[in-house]
Amino acid sequence: MVTPKLHLDLSLTKKMKDHIHEHDHMVQICGEVSSGETSLVGIKKTCGEAPCGFSDAKTSSIEAQERAASMRKLLIAVLLCAIFIVVEVVGGIKANSLAILTDAAHLLSDVAAFAISLFSLWASGWKANPQQSYGFFRIEILGALVSIQMIWLLAGILVYEAIVRLNNGSGEVEGSLMFAVSAVGLLVNIAMAILLGHDHGHGHGHSHDNGHGHSHDHGHGIAATEHHHDSGHDESQLSDVLIEQKKQRNVNIQGAYLHVLGDSIQSVGVMIGGAIIWYKPEWKILDLICTLVFSVIVLGTTIGMLRNILEVLMESTPREIDPTMLEKGVCEIEEVVAVHELHIWAITVGKLLLACHVKIRPEAEADMVLDKIIDYIKREHNISHVTIQIERQ
C-alpha cells in the first residue's frame, strides 16, 4: 500500500516531469523519494541562462561577434585620440595656445567616454554569478563618474589660466602652429567619424527571448509559487527583440560618433581662431576667448552623462518610462483588479527592471494573466526583466 506521503512525492515528481516536457528546461532531482520522508529541499533546478536573465546562450555567439566588432572600432578610436592628445599638448605648449590645450582636454573627455564604452562592451560579456546576480553593468556607471570628475578638474584649470592671462596679459601665440595642429585634429576627427559612422553590423533572424516573470499566487490563505517562462517563439516578437538588442549594442558606437562630431566642430573653431591670429598676431585674445567658450562646451557635454549616472545610482524610474501609464495599461487587462508596489529602475543605462504586485480576480488563471502582463510590458515599454507577484482578490 502506498502511503500518502509517498503518493505526494510521486505526484510532485510527475508534475515536474510534465513541466520539463512543456518548457524544455533542465531539472535535476537530487533527493530520493522515500515512504518515510517527503522533502523538496533536495530538488535542484538549473536553467540555461544567467541569473539576471540578460543573456541567452543561443545568441551568445552572434552577440560576441558584434561585440568584438564594436570593441575593435572603439579601440582604434581610443588609440587615435591618445596619440593626438600628445600631439595637441606638445603643440599647444609650443604655440602658447590655451585653445589647443582645451581641445586636448575635450579630446581627453572623449577618450574617457570611449574607454568606458569599450569597458562596458567587454564587461557585458562577463557572466553573472551568485555574488553579482545582476552582472557587472554598474562598473560602467562608476567609471563614468570618475571620468567626469577628471574632466571638470582639467576644465577648471584651463579656465583659471585663461582668466589669469586675460588679467595679466599673455605671451605671443603662434597662429601658424595653432592652425596646423587644429587642422591635423580635424583630419583625425574625420577619420574617426568614418570609422565609427560606417556600421558593418548585420541583422540575424534568430533570437530567443529569455525574459521571465515570477508570480507568487496568494489566495485564501494558501501561498503557492508559480514560475512563468516566456519562450518567445513567435517570429515577429523574436524580430522585435533582436532589433532592440542590436540598438542596445550599437548605442556605444553612436555615442562615440556624436562625440567625434562635436570634436570636429571645436577643431574648426580653433582653426579659424588660429588663422586669424596667424594673419593678425595682435588678436591673440581670440585664443583665450576660444578657451573659455570651449571649456563651457566641454562641461556642458558632461551634464547629460552626470544626470544619467545620478538617476541610475539613485535607482530612479528611467525617464523613458511613464510609471502611471504603465500601471494604467496593466490595470486595463480584464482579469487585473489593481497594481501596487510598482518599482522600475535601471542597473545601468538601457538595462531596465520592473517588480510589482498584481491583484487579480479569484476566478482568473494566474499563468494566463501573467502572460498578458509580461507581453504588454515588453511590447509597450521595452522592459525585459520583469518580476511579478500575483495576488488573489
Swiss-Prot record:
The keyword Transmembrane is annotated on this UniProt entry: yes
Subcellular location: Membrane
Residues in compartment: Vacuolar: 94-105, 160-176, 279-284
GO molecular function, one term: monoatomic cation transmembrane transporter activity
A GO CC term attached to the entry: membrane
Keywords: Ion transport, Membrane, Metal-binding, Transmembrane, Transmembrane helix, Transport, Zinc, Zinc transport
Residues in coiled coil: none
Pfam families: Cation_efflux (PF01545)
Topological region Cytoplasmic: 1-72, 127-138, 198-257, 306-393
Protein name: Metal tolerance protein A2
Organism: Arabidopsis thaliana
Upper taxonomic lineage: Eukaryota, Viridiplantae, Streptophyta, Embryophyta, Tracheophyta
